[in-house]
């Protein structure tokens, strides 16, 4: 009895069990388990219950509360239930033995493995980095319990206000803040290291991108050469097939009768004789070889400019020796037509930046032009409009000068002489000339089989390109007089200002189906109906001559010498948006994303329609004012983000936009 009584009075409850049927023997008795359970229950109640002094045992309450939350998870409960089915003997046997523990404690890694550890330039250990990250995690957890923390801070504030803080508490708080400052320094250095790594990766990616762009440019050059060779081979095959077909056709039978019989036949039947003589004469005259029209097929579209940054220069070409008056191209890296005051019209291959020929025929400088599907229309100061078909090109090398004045400078002659060996004159491209205006042609536009031309004779003419004749003449002055007489709300009312004498009377035109938009020197934009020949609507807003315009399905954009660009809503006839520059607008064009304009500066003015951002593009960007300045931009053209500009010194450059 004394022996059992001493076991009950043992403070540990299990430490005094020495029977062979104890924990290491056959098992634990129910009495020992009940005693252990009572002690655990009392200990847990003491730890988790409310304490009279909040300064002692607070971390125990927090720890047990966390354990209680973890025990509520279903996975944890299943593990506990499975643990109760295991006997204490199995639990003890599942532990590591003393030998295994000693072996793991004294084991060490060989020097070969330690030598392969990479060197690290960081002065902070992995554990310090973990501590810094752990502090961030604890900070986020504290924010989740913001309400409870705020209440605790209020209680601490009340306590501190009531009782002065002890020096030991202040020292602990100082040490805590110093530790946090040290961890903040570690985290800052870690962030700086990550930023440097990211910068290095970005630089490497930029270098890789440049290498791939160069490779893409080379592939497109090879592709263009292969396409050119393929077109030449196909043309040769077509020529050989035509020659074979001509050789298979039998020659016409020659008459065997004598000349006397022929004379008698002619005298007997005059009509028959005339026909016979006509045939015989024309058979003896060598007829020119007919040129078969060949369409220039584009098998692939260039994509290099799509990967350049906006504002990057693609090519710069010394195109002319005088100011560029008109430029246009069909598609990016395709065919470009340029005209200037040096009385030349040049055809360019934008893929290689080379002049491939000239369009000769005008007696004066070309003021306006357009290219569409190998068809080129040019309007000149000689009051004529000429049509050209580039698919009928037959190139022969010759001098590139069209008309040269005697007072030309020697530098211009040297430039032409240097380009003569590399340029060719396009023959057989001329189709016909449209001659009806009595003054210079200042604007033109064609769509389908309809061409509209505007002239300084103050008229607009509609041409049928199939028949090659004028089908309608629109008198702009008569339309303006009629509008001022009617005085309706949507028509023009005289403002008392006179048109600028230096400006073109018809500054810009564009047609689509039966709709025609025309901008004139009086600042008016008139919308015509070609079916009736009447002005459908007049847009009032500009205070200077209209120099350029373009419209799509919804909006019409106009540029004027009053330094403003206005965007009109075609559905209502009102102004949708407007902005201005420092100098007059000489040229303008837009695509789906941007509006580009030449505004009397050495840069192209770009306006993003999506976000309303204005920026400059061209050779004048970033140029020091004290150094040499690029020439003023006179003409701009934009298609699919591919920008071409023509300058006052005759240089033409291509940019990404």
Curated annotation (Swiss-Prot):
Mode of membrane association: Peripheral membrane protein
Biased composition (Basic residues): 141-152
UniProt repeat feature WD, residue ranges: 319-360, 361-398, 436-475, 481-538, 541-580, 582-617, 628-657
Coiled-coil annotated residue ranges, if any: 210-250
GO CC, any one term: transferase complex
Signal sequence region: none
Family annotation (Pfam families): WD40 (PF00400)
Localization terms from the record: Mitochondrion outer membrane
Positions of the UniProt region annotated as Disordered: 1-23, 140-174, 242-268, 398-420
Main location: mitochondrion
UniProt biased composition (Basic and acidic residues): 1-10
Top-level division of the source organism's lineage: Eukaryota
Keywords, in A-Z order: Coiled coil, Membrane, Mitochondrion, Mitochondrion outer membrane, Repeat, WD repeat
UniProt xrefs under SMART domains: WD40
Protein family per UniProt: Belongs to the WD repeat MDV1/CAF4 family.
Function: Involved in mitochondrial fission. Acts as an adapter protein required to form mitochondrial fission complexes. Formation of these complexes is required to promote constriction and fission of the mitochondrial compartment at a late step in mitochondrial division.
Protein name: Mitochondrial division protein 1
Gene name, Swiss-Prot/TrEMBL: mdv1
């Amino acid at each position: 009895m004394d022996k059992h009584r001493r076991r009950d009075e043992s403070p540990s409850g299990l430490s005094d069990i020495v029977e062979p049927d104890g924990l290491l023997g056959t098992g634990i008795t129910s009495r020992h388990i009940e005693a252990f359970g009572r002690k655990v229950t009392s200990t847990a109640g003491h730890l988790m219950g409310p304490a009279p002094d909040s300064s002692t045992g607070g971390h125990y309450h927090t720890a047990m509360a966390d354990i209680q939350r973890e025990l509520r998870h279903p996975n944890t409960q299943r593990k506990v239930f499975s643990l109760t089915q295991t006997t204490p003997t199995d639990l003890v046997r599942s532990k590591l033995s003393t030998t295994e523990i000693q072996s793991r404690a004294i084991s060490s890694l060989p020097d070969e493995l330690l030598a392969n550890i990479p060197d690290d330039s960081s002065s902070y250990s992995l554990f310090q980095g973990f501590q810094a990250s752990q502090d961030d995690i604890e900070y986020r957890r504290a924010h989740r319990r913001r309400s409870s923390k705020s209440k605790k801070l209020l209680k601490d504030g009340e306590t501190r206000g009531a009782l002065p803080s002890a020096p030991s508490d202040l020292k602990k708080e100082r040490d805590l803040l110093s530790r946090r400052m040290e961890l903040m320094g570690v985290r800052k250095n870690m962030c700086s290291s990550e930023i440097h790594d990211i910068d290095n990766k970005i630089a490497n990616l930029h270098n890789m991108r440049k290498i791939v762009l160069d490779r893409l440019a080379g592939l497109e050059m090879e592709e263009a050469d292969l396409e050119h060779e393929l077109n030449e081979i196909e043309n040769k095959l077509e020529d050989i097939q035509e020659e074979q077909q001509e050789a298979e056709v039998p020659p016409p039978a020659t008459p065997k009768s004598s000349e006397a019989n022929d004379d008698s036949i002619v005298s007997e039947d005059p009509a028959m004789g005339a026909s016979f003589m006509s045939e015989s004469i024309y058979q003896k005259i060598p007829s020119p070889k007919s040129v078969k029209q060949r369409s220039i097929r584009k098998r692939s579209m260039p994509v290099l400019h799509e990967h350049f940054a906006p504002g990057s220069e693609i090519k710069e070409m010394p195109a002319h020796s005088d100011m560029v008056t008109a430029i246009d191209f069909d598609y990016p890296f395709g065919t470009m037509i340029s005209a200037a005051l040096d009385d030349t019209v040049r055809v360019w291959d934008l893929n290689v930046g080379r002049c491939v020929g000239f369009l000769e025929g005008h007696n004066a400088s070309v003021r306006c032009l357009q290219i569409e599907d190998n068809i080129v229309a040019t309007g000149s100061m000689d009051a004529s409009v000429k049509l050209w078909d580039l698919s009928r090109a037959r190139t022969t090398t010759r001098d590139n000068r069209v008309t040269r004045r005697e007072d030309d400078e020697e530098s211009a002659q040297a430039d032409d002489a240097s380009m003569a060996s590399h340029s060719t004159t396009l023959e057989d491209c001329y189709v016909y000339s449209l001659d009806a205006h009595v003054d210079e042609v200042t604007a033109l536009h064609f769509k389908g089989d309809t061409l509209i031309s505007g002239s300084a004779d103050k008229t607009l003419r509609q041409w049928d390109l199939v028949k090659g004749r004028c089908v309608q003449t629109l008198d702009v002055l008569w339309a303006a007089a009629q509008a001022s007489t009617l005085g309706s709300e949507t028509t023009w009312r005289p403002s008392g200002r006179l048109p600028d004498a230096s400006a073109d009377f018809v500054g810009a035109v564009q047609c689509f189906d039966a709709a025609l938009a025309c901008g004139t020197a009086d600042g008016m934009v008139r919308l015509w109906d070609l079916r009736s020949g009447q002005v459908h609507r007049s847009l009032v807003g500009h205070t200077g001559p209209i120099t350029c315009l373009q419209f799509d399905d919804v909006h019409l954009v106009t540029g004027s010498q009053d330094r403003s660009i206005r965007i009109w809503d075609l559905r209502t006839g009102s102004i949708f948006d407007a902005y201005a520059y420092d100098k007059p607008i000489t040229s303008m064009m837009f695509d789906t994303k941007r509006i580009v304009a030449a505004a009397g500066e050495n840069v192209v003015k770009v306006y993003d329609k999506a976000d309303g951002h204005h920026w400059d593009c061209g050779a004048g960007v970033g140029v020091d004012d004290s150094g040499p300045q690029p020439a003023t931009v006179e003409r701009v053209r934009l298609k699919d983000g591919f920008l071409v500009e023509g300058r006052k010194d005759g240089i033409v450059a291509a940019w990404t936009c």
